């Protein structure tokens, strides 16, 4: 589709500039009537791929119409007879994408239109819970999680799936409130709270200082994977001490099964950014996406394992040339740089209020534009100066500085030690 590149990013690091440009090109190639997964092989709409496309879109095109078309397409018609794309986790991403869209766009009318289909989709999910109120793979379900280079057990109750399920119930409660469904709000809040209360007793392992991967017949497995742990961090489902424990025992621990898809690197690096590790994430972005560029990539791939060489990079699904070399989920630096380096995100729907918390992450300077429903937010930052310009809404700027900063407009207020 013809798209206007409303968002942009530039910095002193030319490799990172190239990563942003190739990410934007990858997104554009995979934007048609809908946000599709890859431009050559599947050309299909998958909910897990799509939610990342939406989030990247909010920092690049701000194309709301393509978001709405894709969300409607993925839902389909009633009665519900399977999960979204038959994949359990993809159903949960579908719920989450609706409220994300509302927060960025402010479009309540769309939520009102979609809410009855959200209810019937959630009824389908609730009808497939076990005696613990949790979800397990049933006949006809694809429990996906990720394309992993190691063994991922899909048996029993996966901690990752329960966390997504819990967030989906919370999302249903928020959407129920938006449409004035008081009974629905109460119902979904109660279900979400009950499930959330079970997460730590069921899956947290004090010895491993992490969520275990799954429970089978009420028994924790020995396996720890990154998935549930990183989602629990940026969903803020754990206290600060446990989040910091996860950072060391899982996210920065090379002995834990590594993620080799940009799909899940998206969430892994988001969790690290949420924990203030932008310097480390910058190195990872340059190594991982820069690694693809060094292999000759002109768009970003479905999967990249730096340990592979030559034509191994082209193989997937048991086929020597099976890999998609232009895959939307490969473009996640667009989102990470907009939200966690320029530091821009909506606080109230449609950017009526927004937060700006820029972090250089090892750069000397950076600047960029983040689109909003009726304008833009422009951010420039170096080690001594910050400039922010917004065309709409009320903004809250947060910076870290040992000394009180000087402002041309307004008076900085101290939030905590070194934070203004």
Where are the regions that the model predicts?
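Hydrophobic, well-ordered secondary-structure elements that form the walls
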Residues: 23, 107, 232, 268, ...
